[in-house]
């Protein structure tokens, strides 16, 4: 029913490499990292044999005495028994790795299609197809023959200018093309921002629950993470009172995600204003993740954090992926929203430029198409997507309320997700959120995202960015699963 390329687990690959960075006179220590695409083990862990470095003796033994074919050489490229920082981060803090692991629990011989309710990629569903204007812009850029070259590290000038104009429409000041840096999706934008801010001894404030890529990148860069809570009883508002208590002189930034992934809430102008004032008082910049910007369908309109750039300097992360439903196009950006030029002395633009000069680029033809994508996409397309998400979010919220073992504290008003609490005391034989998701996948072929990877143990994240019939089917399967696993003692029910 659905494209399989998003769900198939990759081959497990590990390799060791040395990386060092130097930006504007600031040296970052060389470190050894190990990257791995293998998914983490959650339940029914089997004892694994540690892989030791290849020695001459081992090579000789495996080669019948060690012929002179190089196998007797002691190679220093090893498969470590314990992964490096990035491998560890990817193992514990990657939605993709967790999704692969849970997908492996699905019975491939089952008669029903797998329902992907774990991640926000509705592009496989026909009703969520991107705008014709966006497709035409890409086709025209390709056919022109003008965009087959390497782009500048920071992006094509015309594309940067188009993003600046696009964002400026909702801000009380104008951005210039020099304020915009194009990235290979929002994921690379996170990598850039976290990497340039990481200094020995510094820390960053991240939301809990939150998007795990921030924690993974912080771990990779030896940047200490300090969490502030989002309060479910208050519509997932930020616990502002806790910010000053967890920050100190070494705090470098705070991350805000709005509209929120994973919670589905949208922050009001007043709440964002308070966040800006707290950040100003602490002397830290705000990183605002607006990848789901304008995907709102509740009572609160989307307010760009950049509106408060006169209070506190802001780095905005955005992309085409979600609003245009094209995550595979890998086009994102970092925007410096700093009308008072507070960050000028920090040379943050130079740091970003230097990083991107030694990093990968978004595809040139997508950059070439970007001005026409932003300019020509009709409002009717955006309205259609909002109408779809409004309908499916309502279906999701109503369906969750009808399932006794799960609780939704706040109806989603934006993004593509909702966080749901598991009432495990009502269930038999379910140990935690990961166990719930694995057993659900095995028995019902429904894939959910466990809250543990998002910082909320015994919660799950559900996406409603899916066709309505599949969503209804998925909710019915979750309900059936809970009914089968409910505790027999009726006194346990409320």
Swiss-Prot record:
InterPro entries in the record: Aminotransferase_I/II_large (IPR004839), PyrdxlP-dep_Trfase (IPR015424), PyrdxlP-dep_Trfase_major (IPR015421), PyrdxlP-dep_Trfase_small (IPR015422), TyrNic_aminoTrfase (IPR005958)
N6-(pyridoxal phosphate)lysine carried by residues: 322
Known cofactor(s): pyridoxal 5'-phosphate
Tissue specificity remark: Expressed in companion and pericycle cells adjacent to the protoxylem of roots. Expressed in companion cells of shoots.
Comp. bias (Low complexity): 24-38, 48-62
SUPFAM superfamilies to which the protein is assigned, alphabetical: PLP-dependent transferases
This protein's UniProt keywords: Aminotransferase, Pyridoxal phosphate, Transferase
Catalysis: reaction(s): nicotianamine + 2-oxoglutarate = 3''-deamino-3''-oxonicotianamine + L-glutamate
Biological processes annotated in GO: biosynthetic process; tyrosine catabolic process
Disordered: annotated span: 24-76
Signal peptide range: none
EC number(s) per entry: 2.6.1.80
Role: Involved in biosynthesis of mugineic acid family phytosiderophores, which are ferric iron chelators produced in graminaceous plants in response to iron deficiency.
NCBIfam families (alphabetical): tyr_nico_aTase
Protein name: Nicotianamine aminotransferase 1
Organism placement in taxonomy: Eukaryota, Viridiplantae, Streptophyta, Embryophyta, Tracheophyta
């Amino acid at each position: 029913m659905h494209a399989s390329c998003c769900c198939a687990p990759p081959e497990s690959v590990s390799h060791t490499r040395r990386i060092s960075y130097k930006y504007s006179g600031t040296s970052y220590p060389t470190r050894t990292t190990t990257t791995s695409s293998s998914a983490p083990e959650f339940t029914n862990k089997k004892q694994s044999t540690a892989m030791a470095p290849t020695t001459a003796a081992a090579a000789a033994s495996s080669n019948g005495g060690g012929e002179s074919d190089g196998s007797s050489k002691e190679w220093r490229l090893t498969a470590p028994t314990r992964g490096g920082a990035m491998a560890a981060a990817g193992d514990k803090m990657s939605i993709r790795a967790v999704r692969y692991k849970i997908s492996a629990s699905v019975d491939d011989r089952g008669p029903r299609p797998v329902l992907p309710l774990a991640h926000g990629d509705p592009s496989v569903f026909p009703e969520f197809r991107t705008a014709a204007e966006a497709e035409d812009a890409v086709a025209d850029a390709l056919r022109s023959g003008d965009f087959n070259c390497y782009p500048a590290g920071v992006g094509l000038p015309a594309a940067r200018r188009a993003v600046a104009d696009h964002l400026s429409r909702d801000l009380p000041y104008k951005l210039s093309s020099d304020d915009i840096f194009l990235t290979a999706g929002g994921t690379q934008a996170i990598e850039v921002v976290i990497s340039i801010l990481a200094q020995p001894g510094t820390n960053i404030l991240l939301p809990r629950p939150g998007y795990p890529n921030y924690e993974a990148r912080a771990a990779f860069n030896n940047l200490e993470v300090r969490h502030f809570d989002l309060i479910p009883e208050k519509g997932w508002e930020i616990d502002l009172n806790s910010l000053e208590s967890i920050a100190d002189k070494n705090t470098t930034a705070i991350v805000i995600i709005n509209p929120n992934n994973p919670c589905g809430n949208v922050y009001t102008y007043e709440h964002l204003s308070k966040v800006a004032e707290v950040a100003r008082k602490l002397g830290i910049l705000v990183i605002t993740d607006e990848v789901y910007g304008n995907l709102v369908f509740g009572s609160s309109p989307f307010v760009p954090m950049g509106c408060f750039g006169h209070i506190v300097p802001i780095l905005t992360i955005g992309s085409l992926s979600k609003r245009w439903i094209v995550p595979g196009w890998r086009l994102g950006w970092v925007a410096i929203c700093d009308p008072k030029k507070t960050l000028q002395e920090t040379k943050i633009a130079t740091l970003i430029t230097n990083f991107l000069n030694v990093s990968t680029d978004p595809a040139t033809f997508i950059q070439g198409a970007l001005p026409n994508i932003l300019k020509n996409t009709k409002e009717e397309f955006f309205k259609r997507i909002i109408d779809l998400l409004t309908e499916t979010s309502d279906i999701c919220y109503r369906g969750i309320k009808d399932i006794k073992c799960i609780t939704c504290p706040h109806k989603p008003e934006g993004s593509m997700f909702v966080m749901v609490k598991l009432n495990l005391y009502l269930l038999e034989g379910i140990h935690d959120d990961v166990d719930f998701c694995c057993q659900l996948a095995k028995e019902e072929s429904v894939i959910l995202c466990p809250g543990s990877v998002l910082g909320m143990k015994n919660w799950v994240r559900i996406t409603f960015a899916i066709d309505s019939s599949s969503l209804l089917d998925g909710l019915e399967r979750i309900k059936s699963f809970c009914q089968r696993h409910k505790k027999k003692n009726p006194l346990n029910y409320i």
